[in-house]
Amino acid sequence: MGEDMEKTMRFGFDKEKNTKHKALLLTIYEALQEKGYNPINQLVGYLLSGDPAYITSHKNARNLIRKIERDELLEELLKVYLERE
């Protein structure tokens, strides 16, 4: 058991999901904006807490956000942020 605790685990995702996630995230962003919320703040609240109550039900956004695993979304966001010039 001690050896297992010393190994670094690998974490990976299916790259094909990226395009689908972007489309869903844009729809969610627009729905939040249309309802007068700050989309970034609301999405951060959701990502930190996992509580879908941070996302409006307008345009079915709350159900859409549940289709994206939070860890996958965080991975994609970090990748884009770190690869920016």
From Swiss-Prot:
It comes from Carboxydothermus hydrogenoformans (strain ATCC BAA-161 / DSM 6008 / Z-2901). This is UPF0297 protein CHY_0540. InterPro entries: IreB (IPR009309). It comes from the Bacteria. Pfam families: IreB (PF06135). Signal peptide: none annotated. Belongs to the UPF0297 family.
